[in-house]
Amino acid sequence: MSSASIKKIIPCKKNQLIEMVLDIEKYPEFVPWCIEGKIYEKKNSEDLISFNGDLKVGKSILNETFSSYVSYHKETDKIIVTNLNGPLKHLKNEWHFKEINNNTQLEFFIDFELKNPILNGIMKKSFELGLNKIAKAFEVRAVQLYKQC
């Protein structure tokens, strides 16, 4: 398994960042290696927003689709992503949001394992570099959309 966490202060309001993270259909516009994002079966209740989502990731002819269950818990300002289908054997991804003076402290945690042991080994070697690149893409996107820096 590969796991990592990132903690950053992002120059936008908490609700703006949460909305951006939940909008996976826009990920291809800014997330490296993301080709397509789709949302299915979206539900919105008083305390929870949830949906099933697909992310197609890769480069040129090498790509995979990951299906996940995404839930945003309004009371705790936490987004939890778990694996439904695709090349992952295991996925736990959490986003925690805390507003601090019109900025948002974002804590991101991911733990995953691919079904293919060879690909799993390759991913472990480049995982941290890729994760940092993706985290930077979210930060840049937030600044572009909300310009509070």
What are these regions (language model features)?
Residues M1-L48, N102:
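Hydrophobic ligand-binding cavity/cleft-lining segments
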Residues S3-K7, S50, T65-S67, H90-K92, ...:
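Intrinsic-disorder/low-complexity, polar/charged segments enriched in Ser/Thr/Lys/Arg/Asp/Glu/Gln
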Residues K8, G37-I39, F66-Y72, K92-E99:
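Hydrophobic/aromatic beta-strand elements that line small-molecule binding cavities or substrate pockets
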Residues I9-K13, K56-G58, S71-H73, K98-I100, ...:
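Solvent-exposed residues in well-ordered beta-strands and their adjoining turns
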Residues L17-V21, Y27, V70, F108, ...:
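Hydrophobic pocket/interface hotspot
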Residues I39-L84, A137:
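Glycine-rich portal/gate segments that line the openings of hydrophobic small-molecule binding cavities
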Residues T82-L129, K133:
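Beta-strand/loop substructures that line and gate deep hydrophobic ligand-binding cavities in soluble
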Residues V140-C149:
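Short, highly charged C-terminal tails/helix-capping segments
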